Each structure stands twice: as structure tokens, then as C-alpha cells.
Amino acid sequence: MSPSRPAADERFDSARVAAEIATLAEKHTGNDAAFRTALAMLMKAELAKARTEAEAQLLRDRHGRRCAERLCYVQDAIIRLLFNAATEYLYNTPTPSSSERMTVVATGGYGRGLMAPESDIDLLFILPYKQTAWGEQVAEVILYCLWDIGLKVGHATRSVDECIRQARADMTIRTAILETRFLAGDEALYAELVERFDKEVVEGTAAEFVAAKLAEREERHRRSGQSRYLVEPNVKDGKGGLRDLHTLFWIAKYVYRVREASELSERGVFDPAEFRTFRRCEDFLWSVRCNIHFVTKRAEDRLSFDLQREIGVRLGYTSHPGMQDVERFMKHYFLIAKEVGNLTAILCAKLEDQQAKAAPALTRMMARLRPAAKRRRVPESDDFVIDNNRINLAVPDVFKHDPVNLIRIFRLAQKNNLAFHPDAMRSVTRSLSLITPQLRDNPEANRLFVEILTSDNAEPVLRRMNETGVLGRFIRAFGRIVSMMQFNMYHSYTVDEHLIRCVGNLQEIERGGNDEFALSSELIRKIRPDHRAVLYAAVLLHDIAKGQPEDHSTAGAKVARRLCPRFGFSTADTELVAWLIEKHLVMSTVAQSRDLSDRKTIENFAAVVETVEQMKMLTILTTADIRGVGPGVWNGWKAQLIRTLYYETEPVLTGGFSEVNRAERIRAAQAEFRAAFTEWPEADLNAYVARHYPAYWLKVDLQRKIRHARFLRASEQAGHKLAINVGFDEARAVTELTILAVDHPWLLSVIAGACASAGANIVDAQIYTTTDGRALDTISISREYDRDEDEGRRATRIGETIEEVLEGKLRLPEAVARRASSGSKAKLRAFVVEPEVEINNNWSDRYTVIEVSGLDRPGLLYQLTTAISKLNLNIASAHVATFGERARDVFYVTDLLGAQITAPTRQAAIKRALVHLLANGDAAEKPAA
């Protein structure tokens, strides 16, 4: 509740502006409306000039906190000038009564003395008693002028009694009053509020307040994304953002009665180094937030992809080999978020310890306090004790005495299900210099680490090791990818968080019981017992070489060959880890972009995986990896593709033997389907089953088969030759359009063009043909609306467009051109994806495989299929997928005579045309002969 202090280099001249106001008042004597209009115009000009100067200064010195202080100081000055203008020139009362007093107070974020350029202003008008005509008029002048300036103002008018009463009942109001700051008016009235608030509201309610604030924090994180490593973070409300720092300060103000952030160190809340970290984090986050507001010219707090590069450049980041400027900036951002998390953990643990909590449950509720439990020794070690159900050091120098304890403490906490005592956490972070080459090579330290990795609850323990800095010091290659962001729309987390989540996925696979992982859960029980640790190591390390100029799979295998002998792995096991890392993308690529019914696909994949044991391990790694990319990325469709690839390949590797051969799997899939339709007549079931080729029964999951059957039956009973069904996949944030039509070579192109003309972006396509010549295509399009009702109406419009095109009522080229002229999304424009086209005859004996990769855009699939047809090629099958901003589409084609494309000159012409299309949006080549 301290008064605002101007930044040292502040140049706002209040005296000059006050003189101009006096001149305006004299000029407009007797015309209050004209004076108020002129007053607002003057203030608007002054504020605009001050903001321009603040932005220029921020670009020069990059001090975010100083910029926020400067903007706040200017706003303070404007409000004081408005208050003075209202009370001196408009509603002057030479002898005010006791009720004609008012205090103008800043609250909320503004009350902290820090403002982002487009932030709202929260004001509290405090009165001694009830509202008076004079008070209402003065408040009205201030508010209307601020609104005329273009500011968003939240406001309330209350007496001191009302403030106290409402603060007791409402935690939001209590927090707002906690952060009030005097601006103008009667200081005695403000002093009364402060004194009564401390005595009548704060005293004896610390536990209640802390519990409420931490519960709010958890809910805020849930809304904005639980992980602090989400790649489009919310700088204000996200985990590790400014609001977390604010929560720390609120709690400290309430519990320790500090007034200024500098007192956090004086009161022992943080040690001097931790307070310097607090200030450094705060300054960086304010720099980012202020720059976002200046760039967008709105109160935007999400650091979205289309902003990240520009903000990074404004903050002075440059590209280095293997890392773009934007990736270096975001790595720094996530390192800061990690440090904010550490500060939060330290304060929360300190509070809980002081309150002698039985478990770290402040984030859930601060229940009744009880006396501290007696310290007792941790089993298996004399160096650590259990202190209030937290692991702590028996003596201060346990790490210096034996550096292996820096690893051992995490293993003991894991085995005994203990949280960390704040003193232990601090000691760990202060002892990182003890993690030397000698400790990294220590057999006991490495044995303990492998135990951590392969034991229950490895994910949270590894995350704690990462957040304290131990993991990155102990495995230096891991340290290089800590907080590393990949600048793309596919990965939802930083590299280190992705790897740790993948370990958690592996443990969930091993526990079993989740149908998402049915195949992998079955396989993990069948791998050799001595390969279990190999699998865990491969999962933890598979992306460890991200950010290097060399391909990360190849470079990661080299890291594994250096690292795994440290872990006690044999030469053979080390090579197996390296192989898994080197091949970790192969199974996903083949499953999603190759024709799994083509014998050559299976033979080629079998040649890569070599043995059933290696294929089992690669299947499990692939499953854990895909699920760790982000919410909804792993789904039933991909699970079915992986399952099909596995079981199609198994007989090739075993010389014809398979635990479940192909014919049996087809029969089992059909039996499973039949069991879902007991109400159908047997003849109808037999006829329907016969309509689908074997690949359909192997590649499509049961729920989709059921939907297809009901859709086909209803459409045909209604006499529809063309029908469209709409479904929603919330996990993937897509809408599915299933289209039933008479099959013909241009059908996919027509559907893609219809979607493009309707503004729908295709992210996936599953294409099947029935034995009676009907096409059954499921197209997944990006979801545009949150509510299913709105999305359903949009999908219906898209379906109508598809029908109009297929019925010849709408010409596609013109419709697509009209939609394309509206431009693509800004988020996609933030990315650069080099176009790539590969033409290969080795993946099929019958078809030429064309694989294209480039920046996704509305209408791309239509453009590609149209161009391929114009190149006199027939598309036999297509495998369509998007990975964030990158489209990767694979087409199995022949020439018009049904032969592969073997002539090098023709292959080169096809490649030139498609590369040009990917880069420029049109095909430059004429049809090839």
C-alpha cells in the first residue's frame, strides 16, 4: 500500500500539464462541458506521447519493470490532475462538510504500481459515509474523462465500513484492498482503511487467505494450461507467469506483513540470491508483456506463435547454429518460468513447514493445523531425516560430504513418498556446483539414477530433478534441451517436458488398464526383462539432441553411446538404446504415411526393425512418444495404424509365424463388429461385411466401423447416393466429415476443393473404397468453434458445399480462388517450412510413392490433387496428415496406363511442379506426357 514512485528517468511534467489545465479552465469558464472535452483531449495527447516514449525507452534498455513503473507513474499523474481539475474548477467546495471528502485509490494490478501499456485501470473511490452528490460528481468527471481517453476502467465507490465488510466476505475484494495505493484526495481516510483492514480483516486469517490464493492459482493454471512448458504461454496467467509472482507477493504481504517486494529478503521469505531471481524473473516477464501490448495494441497476454519471433527480435535475440532466434528467446522464457516455479515451491513449502502441515496440501486446502511431527531418520540413510513428513538434511553439509547425496535424496524421496523440505530444496540448488565429472561417472550415483528412472512415480521425481537443476547438470546433454522450445505448432511442450511426460506415458503403458495403449501394454510384458531399463533410457533420451545442426535422431544415438555405459549398460544394451533413438520416428512415419496393405511397405519396415524384440520396443517407444507430443495427438486412429503395422510385419520377421495371423485378425475384427449389430438380420450383416476389403477391417477402429455401418445403412435406406455425416473429436479439436459417394478418380480432389472453398482446413483424411464401387472417405477438418452447436452448423454448410460440387452446382476453381484471396491464418504465416518432394519406387512394387511436405494452408490438398491429376497421374491412394503447421501428404500414383513413373526426366518434372506449388500456391509445370 505504498505510494507510487516515479522511475528515476521519468520525464512526465505534471506542473506543465497542470498549467495547461488552468489555461483551459479559464478559457472555458462557464462552459463545463467544453472544459471537460478539452481536458480529455489534452490528457489523451499526453498519454499517447508518454506511451511512445515508454516504448522507445523499452526498446533501448529492455527493462520491463522500469517500463511498467513509468507507465504507471504517468497514469497516476493523469488521475491526480483529473482529481484536482474536478475539485478546483468544476466542483470546488471552499468549506467542505465532513461527508464531502474522498480518496482515490489504485487497486488490483494498478495498485502494485506496475502497468502494461493496454492494461485495465482499477480505481476505488473511498468515502467517509454514504455517497454524496459532490462525491458522485467528482468520480464522474474522472471516470468519463478516462473513458474518453480510451482507457478501460474498473471502479467501485465504497465507504470504509463497506470496504471492511466486503473484504471479510469476498476474497477477491480482500486481495484488491491488500494492493491498494493512495492516488489523490483525503490521505487520512486512506490511512483509516489501511489500519482497519490490518486489524479487522487480516489478523488471524493468514491460513484462510493462503489456501484461497493457492486454490485460485491451481484453477488459473487449469484454465490456461497446467504445464509451464506449453509452447504458447500466457505471460500473465500461465504457470510460471507474472500472476504466480503476484500470488507470491500477495501471500508474503498477508502472512509476513511486508509492504515492498524488497522486504521479502529482509523478512527471510527469500534469501538474497532468491530475491535477485525474483526481480530478474519479474523484469523479464514485464519486458515480454509490455512488448506484446505495444506490438498488438491490445491487452493481449498470450505469447502466440505469430508474436514470438517479433518479440524475440525486439528483445535482442539472434539465431545460432541449430537454434532460431525465436527458439533461443522461448528457451529463455521457459527457463524464467521454471525459476518462478522454484520460487513458488520454496514459499509454499516454507509456509507449510511453518504451519507444521502433515502433507504438502496447501494447494488443496489449508485445514486445521497440528503440532510438528518429530524428526526421524530416513530409512537407508543417516544423512537425511523426515521433518514434518518432508525429506530434509540431517546436517547442513551432507552434499559436500558426499555429492552422491544430490542423487540419493531424490531416490529416497521417491521410495518413501516424501515431499521436499524447503531447506533441502534450497540446499540442493546451492550445491549444483558439486555435480562434477567425478560425480557423473560415479557408479553409485548412476545406479541410483537408473533406479529413479525405472521405479514408480518417475515422472514427478524427474520433473523435480529438472526444476532444481540437478537433471541437467547430471546429464549435461539433457541440460542443453532444458526449456528448449521447438518453433512449430505440433509440439505442445518444451523438449525436456516432452521427454519427462513420455517417461510417465511409459509407466502408464506398463501399468496397463488403458485401452489407448492396449497393444503396447501387451507387448511390454513380453519384452526381455533385461530390456526394461533399455526401454526407459531410450524414452528419456530419444529427443535429447534436439537443437543441434545434425539430425536429432542420429545425434541422439551418439549421445546414448556415450551416456549409457555410465548407467551400467552393456555394449549390446547401449547399442540397442542407440538404435531405438535413431529409429524412433520410423514406425510413426510408416504407419501414418504408407499403404499398409502394400506388401513392399511391410517388407521395407521389417528390414528396418530386424527382429520382433526390437519391433516390440519400437512400438512401445512410438506410442509413448506420440502421446507425449500434446493433448489429442495420440488417438484411436493412430493406435489402429500402429497395431496394423505391427501385426502385418510380425510374420515377415518370424518366417510366417505370428501370434495373431492376418486372416485371424480379420476374422476377429469382423466378429467384434458383428457383436455390435445383433439386431441386424444375418443376411444384412453378411452382405455388409463383404462390402469391405481386408485392409478396412485391419486399419479402422471399432467405433468408427460402427459409425460407418449405421451411416451407410441409413443413407441407403433413405435412397441417398451421396450422403455426409458429421462427427466431433474433441480430443483432437477436429470435426469429422464422413462422405459416401460413387467412387471416381477425382473424388478426393473434389472433396478437398469443396472444403477449401468453404474455409475448412483438412488435417487428416482416411480414404476407403467398398467392393461395390462406393467411396467412404472420412475427412478431419480443424475445429473453428468451441460449441458443438456452432461447429455443427459450420460442418453442415461445408457438407452442403461438397454436395453442390459433386452434383455440379458449384464450380470449384472459382470458389477456391475466392476463399484463397481472403488469405491464410496469421499463425501459419509465422512459420517457414521448406517445401520437399520425394518420389520413390522402392516403397511399392505397383505404385510410385510421392511424398510432399510443406507449410499447411487452406486448400493445399485440393491444389496438390489437382496438380497431380493435371500431370497425367492417377491417384490410387492418399495418406494425408498435418503435424502442426507442416502438411505431409503421401500419394500412391501410376501413369495413365497403370505403370510406375520410372523415367528420371518425368520424375524431375513432377518434382519441380509440386515444389513450385508448395512454395507459391500454383503449379508451374504443364502436364507431363
Swiss-Prot record:
It catalyses: [protein-PII]-L-tyrosine + UTP = [protein-PII]-uridylyl-L-tyrosine + diphosphate; [protein-PII]-uridylyl-L-tyrosine + H2O = [protein-PII]-L-tyrosine + UMP + H(+). It comes from the Bacteria. InterPro entries: ACT-like_dom_sf, ACT_dom, HD/PDEase_dom, HD_domain, NT_sf, PII_UdlTrfase/GS_AdlTrfase, Polymerase_NTP_transf_dom, UTase/UR. Keywords: Hydrolase, Magnesium, Multifunctional enzyme, Nitrogen fixation, Nucleotidyltransferase, Repeat, Transferase. Uridylyltransferase (UTase) activity is inhibited by glutamine, while glutamine activates uridylyl-removing (UR) activity. Residues 380-735 are annotated as: Uridylyl-removing. Its EC number is 2.7.7.59, 3.1.4.-. Residues 1-379 are annotated as: Uridylyltransferase. Belongs to the GlnD family. PANTHER family: BIFUNCTIONAL URIDYLYLTRANSFERASE/URIDYLYL-REMOVING ENZYME (PTHR47320), BIFUNCTIONAL URIDYLYLTRANSFERASE_URIDYLYL-REMOVING ENZYME (PTHR47320:SF1). Has four distinct domains: an N-terminal nucleotidyltransferase (NT) domain responsible for UTase activity, a central HD domain that encodes UR activity, and two C-terminal ACT domains that seem to have a role in glutamine sensing. This is Bifunctional uridylyltransferase/uridylyl-removing enzyme. It comes from Rhodopseudomonas palustris (strain ATCC BAA-98 / CGA009). The gene is glnD.
